Swiss-Prot record:
Subcellular location: Nucleus
GO MF term (any one): protein homodimerization activity
Organism expressing this protein natively: Homo sapiens (Human)
Task of the protein: TFIIA is a component of the transcription machinery of RNA polymerase II and plays an important role in transcriptional activation. TFIIA in a complex with TBP mediates transcriptional activity.
Record's keyword terms, sorted: Host-virus interaction, Nucleus, Transcription, Transcription regulation
InterPro entries assigned to the protein according to its UniProt record, in alphabetical order: TFIIA_a-hlx, TFIIA_b-brl, TFIIA_gsu, TFIIA_gsu_C, TFIIA_gsu_N
Keyword Cytoplasm among UniProt keywords: no
GO cellular component, one term: nucleoplasm
Pfam family, one: TFIIA_gamma_N
Main localisation: nucleus
Name of encoding gene: GTF2A2
Protein name, UniProt field: Transcription initiation factor IIA subunit 2
Protein's UniProt keywords contain Translocase: no
Amino acid sequence: MAYQLYRNTTLGNSLQESLDELIQSQQITPQLALQVLLQFDKAINAALAQRVRNRVNFRGSLNTYRFCDNVWTFVLNDVEFREVTELIKVDKVKIVACDGKNTGSNTTE
């Protein structure tokens, strides 16, 4: 099963809103909407793992951290993100990090 972290992104929220509208107008069933979301989870995780090759460095002050159910959560303050030609400063960042390897069954889906 793929992580559902990306459902709370702009793309994921837009997809969920569109699916909700289709359910309300009875154009699709809730079960079909769930299948679409599950496919989105798999596709976005695979695309990010295979296609994104940019590198960004960041530095900040660690406020809190937590490790629960194989998921790390970090909250950083006064963070600087550096790319090759760009520097972005933000007051607070929450990072959620999950194991990128498939820890489930060995079946291919």
